[in-house]
């Protein structure tokens, strides 16, 4: 197909998103309100807050531009179909979920393609509420540190055992519980792109 535009928005959030002017693909990719929380060298990541059932929730909107030629050529050289950052991230999040690895929740995403070439996209993810793994580790006792490293190793071992060669750094983990029995109870994996 010459020109293709994909858009997915969770039904439960459509009304709240439309109330701040986010209805169509273009609205998401040109959204400029909210604080920029990404480094200049990374794709734009902005925060936005919505009131859902009387509670204020924070979301991160990751916007991507046109895919660089060298990335597409590298994919073709490796006999892969060129894939945008948005499509890659949605695919990885789905893969993690399919293997019962707790991961951040995307609530909206979209991509625009011309002759199969990514011309931009976005992904909107819900904030994971908890404490950053690195901060928890720093303030933990020696016994807790050992346990945290053990379950971090358990997470990495699970990923590798299932053939998932994705980098998960300690900075990419949020501790959502103080139950350090297993990574599934304690950690949620996020994609950290902010400075």
Residues of each region from the PLM?
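Juxta-kinase regulatory segment immediately upstream of eukaryotic protein kinase catalytic domains
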Residues: 1-36
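Conserved ATP-binding subdomain of kinase catalytic cores across diverse folds
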Residues: 23-132, 161
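Short helix/strand-bridging catalytic loops that position acidic/His residues to coordinate divalent metals
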Residues: 76-81, 113, 138-143, 193-195
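Short, surface-exposed, charged/polar-biased interaction segments
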Residues: 82, 114-117, 146, 173, ...
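Short alpha-helical interface elements
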Residues: 85-86, 118-121, 150, 177, ...
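Conserved kinase catalytic-core helix
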Residues: 87, 92-95, 99-102, 136-172, ...
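Catalytic activation segment of kinase domains across protein kinase-like and atypical kinase folds
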Residues: 167-195
